[in-house]
A protein has these predicted regions:
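Short helix/loop capping segments that flank catalytic or ligand/cofactor-binding pockets
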Residues: 56-57, 244-245, 256-260, 265-266, ...
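Ordered core of a single globular domain
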Residues: 384-389, 394, 398-412, 419-422, ...
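Substrate-recognition/specificity elements adjacent to catalytic centers across diverse enzyme folds
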Residues: 27-259, 270-272, 276-281, 285, ...
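Compact, glycine/acidic-enriched structural inserts
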Residues: 273-275, 279-346, 393-395, 450-462
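Hydrophobic helical h-region of N-terminal Sec-dependent signal peptides
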Residues: 12-20
Length: 658
């Protein structure tokens, strides 16, 4: 039986071979060109093909076998059709949080711009374009093969299970890119509306002080219904391993449900690609994985992906803002949704307002509402980031950590760190994610009001003066996209010792960064301040490393998450990290249940006690400390419980011989 899989433009027909335990069905095209999907233990899909289009075709087909209902529902999300098919008042997943379906649809239809996405992706490689075509064709092929009645119970016979389009797939990527910024603040975008004459606007001094105090106590969460992602990763170089090769331990903490759930696969293009690992969302590439030469994992970066801009409004018209003395009219977009199927339902609609900085938002919990004189706009650095596919395609064929670093040079990594090791015994930590090019000096110079500075210190919300064009993000010609910090000024550690990261600032990834003379506290995103050997690390501000025993004092921060440390009184580097905002697991507490369960850490998190001490070193040498699974420490005690021995834990060793 011949299965024709590719679009008509493809010269050769495509066949799919599916091998299951105890059952093998082979389909071959007349041309002999095939995609093979082999299922081994635990249902892991091993997919091989002659090119990237075939690989993506097989990935989409196999992923749909396991996740077709989830995929079909996610396509409703990115199309803005949830309320039409699933009910207006029911909720759905948007990025890391949940919102009513109507709100999701309104936001999605407003934000998604298919023409802009096509333009942004116009420069991607031929292999990347072929991969996108193959993925769409593979998913649609599965729908044809299964038929409406051959789907799982959750979506069998449902009218909302429809073929995927290229625009749909581009939208799913965009949704993944913005979930650390615009997506997390979708509720704030929807909440923005011009003030009504005669109603109270503004925030009194007392109210503002109360709001800031509340934010400082509980940490600002733009989406209270949302979740957070976090992971742990350790990479050991030849100085820290018995055989002199690289060793990687990846401990990712992503959800068990939804589009961020990992799906494992093994991809092979003979002579070109042989990579295994996991992907999240609708993606034809391995995002965390290994080949015979190098292995990598990811953690969540502390960098910011957006800034807010405080707008000075025309006192006679709250939809007119002023930049350098010149009035500008906000763009007005009204989105109308089709009525859902409920009896008597009426179409929902919402009007959005957009500035040159981005859409207007309202964050009343932070004291950032829309008044007669002031409004706030959001600029997200990951909007129209279509570079990620090429990044992970290149990572899959890297032969060492240096090539892995080069693969990330196009700045497609949206909001994560990379920890890696290679067969030659090299280890790497890199934050080459997308971060706005805004220095600490600029944060200070462009702070529009004391309120903005207070929000930065208390909640990590960067607010710039939108009434001055000079407060636009710096444009460095070395950046992949205007307004980003270029890779040459982002933090990278290349070492034969070890690195680790647990969603913390880069300087915590190896004690040498904390003790090797990098004690200035004017670190900015725009200027290198820290050195690791001959390599520079830049970016994330931190608390001063040389303080008396006890809690270090705060220093001026840039677009990073705030960190703090306690230091041993005898001068040893016993450093505890206080997670003031991100509540994902930190350091060696990876053994604890993740936030989907009510383990000890989750109970502490819900009680507001989110500080998890972590010892980086204690005079015995960092490699020895890590080799003993973090058992050495300044106090010798763990506040939550004894630390287990990780020596028998599952580890990913770099493959290969010679």
């Amino acid at each position: 039986m011949t299965l024709v899989g590719f679009p008509k433009s493809t010269l050769a027909a495509l066949a799919v071979t599916t091998l299951l335990a105890g059952c093998a069905n082979t389909f071959t095209s007349p041309s002999g060109r095939t995609v093979t999907i082999e299922r081994t233990g635990y249902g892991i899909a091993h997919i091989s093909a002659a090119d990237h289009e075939g690989i993506a075709y097989g990935v989409a087909y196999a992923h749909a076998q396991d996740n077709v209902c989830q995929t079909a529902e996610h396509l409703l999300t990115v199309r803005g059709e949830r309320s039409q098919f699933l009910g207006a008042q029911n909720t759905g997943e948007l990025g890391l949080g949940r919102l009513p379906n109507t709100q999701i649809d309104l936001f999605t239809r407003f934000h998604m711009n298919d023409a802009a996405l096509v333009t942004a992706a116009s420069s991607i490689s031929a292999d990347a374009r072929a991969s996108l075509r193959g993925y769409v064709a593979g998913y649609n092929r599965y729908l044809r093969d299964a038929g409406a009645n051959g789907l799982p119970d959750a979506c069998r016979g449902k009218p909302w299970v429809r073929p995927m389009t290229q625009a749909d797939l581009s939208r799913t990527t965009e949704m993944s890119m913005i979930q650390g910024g615009m997506g997390a603040l979708a509720g704030a975008v929807l909440a923005a509306a011009p003030p009504v004459a005669g109603t109270k606007t503004g925030t009194t001094t007392v109210e503002l002080q109360q709001a800031i105090a509340e934010i400082a106590r509980h940490s600002f969460n733009a989406n209270p219904e949302g979740g957070e992602l976090g992971s742990n990763g350790w990479a050991f170089g030849r100085n820290a391993t018995p055989d002199g090769r690289g060793l990687l331990l990846g401990n990712p903490h992503f959800p068990w449900q939804g589009t961020n759930r990992f799906w494992q696969m093994h991809l092979t293009i003979p002579g070109r690609l042989d990579v295994m690992g996991a992907t999240g969302g609708l993606s034809p590439v391995v995002s965390i994985g290994f080949n015979k030469d190098v292995a990598w994992t990811h953690t969540v970066s502390t960098g910011k992906r957006f800034t807010l801009y405080e707008l000075k409004l025309d006192p006679t018209d709250p939809t007119v803002y002023v930049v350098d003395g010149q009035p500008k009219k906000m763009a007005k977009t009204t989105v109308v949704l089709p009525a859902d199927s409920a009896p008597g339902a009426t179409p929902a609609q919402h009007t959005f307002y957009t500035t040159d900085w981005g859409p207007v938002v309202s964050l009343p919990r932070a004291g950032l509402g829309w008044t007669a004189t002031t409004a706030y706009a959001l600029r997200d650095a990951n909007t129209l980031n279509t570079r990620s596919l090429e990044t992970w395609m290149a990572m899959g064929v890297a032969r060492n950590v240096a090539e892995l670093r080069s693969a990330m040079g196009n700045q497609g990594i949206p909001w994560i760190n990379t920890i890696a090791a290679d067969r030659d015994g090299n280890a790497m930590y890199a934050d080459l994610s997308v971060v706005p090019d805004v220095s600490a000096d600029m944060l200070k110079a462009c702070a529009p009001s004391p309120r903005a500075a207070a929000l930065l210190n208390a909640a990590g919300l960067p607010v710039l003066d939108g009434s001055r064009a000079a407060c636009a993000w710096n444009r460095d010609s070395a950046a992949a996209s205007p307004g980003l910090i270029p890779p040459s000024r982002m933090p990278v550690i290349m070492t034969t010792d070890w690195v680790q990261n647990s969603n913390d600032s880069y300087w915590l990834s190896n004690p040498h960064l904390a003790t090797g003379g990098c004690h200035r506290h004017d670190t900015t995103l725009a200027h290198p301040q820290c050195h690791h050997g001959n390599r520079r690390s830049t970016g994330w501000n931190r608390w001063p490393a040389r303080q008396p025993h006890g809690l270090g004092r705060s220093s001026q921060r840039d677009l990073s998450q705030q960190e703090s440390c306690r230091h041993a009184g005898d001068g040893r580097l016993g450093c505890s990290v206080y997670r003031q905002r991100r509540r994902a697991h930190a350091g060696p507490d990876a053994r604890l249940p993740h936030t989907h369960s009510l383990g000890p850490y989750e109970r502490q998190r819900r009680e507001g006690r989110t500080a998890v001490p972590r010892v980086l070193a204690q005079g015995q040498g960092p490699a020895r400390c890590l080799a003993r699974a973090f058992r050495c420490g300044a106090s010798g005690r763990d506040p939550i419980g004894p630390r287990p021995d990780y020596s028998d834990n599952a580890r990913r060793r770099v493959q290969g011989t010679g």
